[in-house]
A protein has these predicted regions:
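Cytochrome P450
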Residues: 1-168
Length: 168
């Protein structure tokens, strides 16, 4: 339980901020999800794909592996750049665009995969779905004023300051 509460604090909070910032940068997407609330689950997946809250995760190779002509030896440290995978043009068309109708948005790797997949991924998605539902019920628009201040981290992608105006 503690892992769910503490482990997802920064990441879910930063995904919430990214939801606001992304819909500010792509106001047509706010309009789409506002007109069709059934898009909320895909909106959440797309926000998490567009700006994954963690840039990477490091692992240690348990055995020698040959990959794309390179050898990763047992014991080597490997960084999996979620940011890069989620913006891979071979997997996502127009990957730098936030598209709440993206058909393969759930194919992101922001939660990792396999035995190391994020334990709280469904909780995070639920929290973000509730956030979107409540924002759309209460506000006609949320506008970001000025440029948000990003946190200084190569690991966590988020914001330390974001001024907004909330429109009824």
């Amino acid at each position: 339980l503690i892992l769910l509460i503490v482990g997802g604090n920064d990441t879910t909070r930063n995904s919430m901020s990214t939801s606001v910032y992304g819909s500010h940068l792509f106001p047509d997407q706010w309009d789409k999800v506002n007109a069709n609330r059934d898009l909320i689950p895909n909106t959440v997946a797309e926000v998490i794909r567009w700006q994954t809250p963690l840039a990477y995760m490091r692992r240690t190779a348990r055995e020698d592996v040959e990959m794309h002509g390179k050898t990763i030896k047992k014991g080597d440290k490997v960084a999996m750049w979620y940011v890069s995978g989620n913006r891979d043009e071979r997997k996502f068309s127009n990957p730098n665009v936030l598209d709440f109708e993206r058909e393969n948005a759930r194919n992101h790797i922001s939660f990792g995969f396999g035995i190391h997949r994020c334990f709280g991924n469904r909780l995070a998605e639920l929290q973000l779905q509730i956030l979107w539902d409540e924002m759309l019920k209460r506000f006609s628009r949320i506008e970001v004023i000025g440029e948000p201040r990003r946190n200084i981290s190569s690991f966590v992608k988020g914001y330390t300051k974001m001024n907004v105006i909330v429109r009824d």
